[in-house]
A protein has these predicted regions:
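Structural motif
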Residues: 2-4, 53-56, 87, 141, ...
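Short, histidine-centered active-site or binding-site loop motifs used for metal coordination
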Residues: 59-60, 144
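Fold-independent oxyanion-binding glycine-rich loops
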Residues: 8-9, 58-59, 91-92
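A short, flexible beta-alpha/helix-coil linker loop
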Residues: 12, 60-63
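Phosphate-binding loop that captures ATP/GTP phosphates
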Residues: 2-55
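A broad, structure-centric signal for solvent-exposed, well-ordered loop/edge residues
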Residues: 37, 44, 53, 63, ...
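Flexible beta-alpha connector loops of hexameric P-loop NTPases
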Residues: 28-35, 62-68, 116-118
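Conserved catalytic-core segment of NTP-binding enzymes
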Residues: 67, 71-168
Length: 169
């Protein structure tokens, strides 16, 4: 496949739901034993959505605690990156050593945010972190979600982008 979507939001990821998939194995299994992963095992753990897209889904339960090391996430991400030219990592809305590391080693970052004050603050922090640690890289792409949702106060798209120093897509 050309593209793999990896749902690293282990407890609450929705990529499996979004693609109507409920695989027996997924990214949590890979994180349990990253040293055992090879291209054949990875292929079996991923769900092929179509000829050009595969999904590496998060578990659909809270039966386990998901306390994996930064090294495990980095190793799994690296091995997945070797299987396809395009890999999208869906990261959870939390801050940890492994999230930071995955962001810093990514070729490109796409920041998805809602146009509200909390997302502006969090987005600004992420953009500033990436600028400080990746000064020669392009800024992240910005995708604003839920723009114009009824009953919600929002920051205008142009103002949001200007505050981050990034042009919204």
């Amino acid at each position: 496949s050309n593209t793999v979507i990896v749902d690293f939001d282990l407890p609450f990821g929705t990529a499996g739901l979004d693609f109507n998939q409920d695989p027996l194995q997924g990214v949590a299994n890979a994180l349990n034993q990253p040293d055992r992963l090879d291209p054949v095992l990875l292929e079996r753990m991923m769900v092929r959505c179509n000829e050009r897209l595969s999904l590496f889904a998060a578990p659909a339960s809270l039966d386990e605690d998901y306390d994996f090391s930064t090294e495990a996430f980095e190793e799994v991400a690296s091995k997945i990156r070797s299987t396809a030219p395009f890999v999208g990592l869906d990261l959870p809305h939390l801050w940890s050593g492994w999230v930071r590391r995955v962001l810093l080693i990514s070729d490109e970052v796409v920041l998805v945010a809602t146009p509200d004050l909390a997302a502006l603050r969090n987005g600004k922090n992420l953009v500033d972190l990436l600028k400080a640690h990746r000064p020669n890289d392009a800024p992240p792409r910005l995708v604003l979600n839920q723009v114009g949702a009824p009953g919600r106060r929002e920051i205008p798209v142009r103002d949001f982008g200007e505050a981050l120093g990034v042009t919204p897509a």
